[in-house]
Design a protein with these regions (language model features):
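N-terminal module-boundary/linker segments of secreted carbohydrate-active enzymes
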Residues: 71, 76-147
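C-terminal motif of bacterial Sec signal peptides marking the signal peptidase cleavage site
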Residues: 57-59
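Secreted/periplasmic proteins that engage bacterial cell-wall peptidoglycan
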Residues: 120-202, 206-207
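Short, Lys/Arg-enriched N-terminal segments with co-localized hydrophobic residues
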Residues: 12-36
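Bacterial signal peptide processing site
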Residues: 61-64
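Domain-level detector of nuclease and nuclease-like folds
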Residues: 177, 185-294
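Bacterial N-terminal signal peptides that target proteins for export
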Residues: 35-47
Length: 294
């Protein structure tokens, strides 16, 4: 797909800037699915680099902000297994970490029964979609029925704390994560992340916000859109470049490269769909069922 190719190239360009830009003692950058807000200390050269990065990432649906991640695993990184990840069938509210593989015949049968409940319809137009229609990125003021909301810590750091291991925090804070180890479900690799290389890990909206908009969220209240954008059920910290390749694709067009996790991914997509009464396309539902067959 053209959008996936463009996002992949843009993410590559942004990564080059982050890797080779001049060092800086302190920075705080947030990318909000197509918009970059930057606070810098340490020189105009890096400021220019950050502006370039925002331009490179603009328009890529599903990209989480650089401040949310970092340190993507290098080629040949150790296999992650599932770490502390929970089976999504046993994690219906998304408050437990990660996505564990669904492997048993009994669990696959449960998964298919869940996916069968998902309604289908054609994908509507993207007209009028803007990220801000779902609230500003990673707000802590989502409706109170959303887990982790209004706890004094923004959504992205809540998710890094949920899924990360060996956490380190900014001095004087129990919210802002500065380094962690992540068992990435999408690639099956272990990522040693630091905030100084933030763009390498992103927070994925499993059911992308643009997809939500096209499937009915355009008619929702603002509160309901803010809920799905910040609900931990719909959010997973993952390898940044891999997430960049997803764009706003449904399961018929994109699945995690780690095949053993695909049934779990399909289940999580279905859980979000059912909770928010959002249909999926018929090809997406067929692909979801296929991942949990056998």
């Amino acid at each position: 797909m053209r959008i996936e190719a463009r996002c992949g190239l843009n993410l590559f360009l942004a990564t080059v800037v982050f890797r080779h830009g001049p060092p800086v003692p302190e920075r705080n950058t947030q990318t909000e699915e197509g918009r970059t807000v930057t606070r810098l200390r340490g020189g105009a050269a890096l400021a220019v680099a950050m502006v370039f990065t925002g331009s490179a990432l603009a328009g890529c649906e599903g990209l989480a902000p650089p401040a949310d991640g970092g340190g993507a695993s290098a080629s040949g990184a150790p296999a992650a297994g599932d770490g502390r990840a929970a089976n999504p069938l046993d994690n219906p509210d998304g408050t437990k970490p990660g996505l564990a593989a669904i492997t048993s015949g009994a669990d696959k049968e449960r998964a298919r029964a869940l996916i069968e409940k998902v309604a289908t319809k054609g994908r509507g137009p993207r007209t009028g979609y803007e990220r801000d229609k779902f609230g500003y990125a990673w707000m802590d003021s989502a409706p109170r029925d959303v887990p982790f909301s209004r706890n004094g810590c923004d959504t992205r750091n809540d998710l890094l704390k949920r899924d990360g291991e060996d956490l380190r925090f900014r001095s004087g804070s129990d919210c802002v994560v500065t380094s962690l180890t992540l068992h990435d479900p999408y690639t099956g690799e272990v990522i040693e992340w630091t905030k100084s290389h933030a763009i390498k890990v992103q927070i994925d909206h499993v059911m992308p916000l643009s997809y939500d908009w096209q499937m009915g969220a355009s008619r929702w209240t603002e509160d309901k859109r803010e809920s799905i954008a910040n609900d931990p059920l719909n959010l997973v910290p993952v390898d940044g470049p891999t997430n960049g390749s997803k764009g706003d694709s449904g399961p018929a067009s994109w699945l995690p490269p780690n095949k053993r996790i695909r049934c779990a991914y399909a289940v999580r997509f279905a859980q979000v769909s059912l909770k928010y009464e959002l249909p999926v396309t018929a090809p997406d539902k067929d692909m979801m069922l296929k991942q949990c067959s056998g």
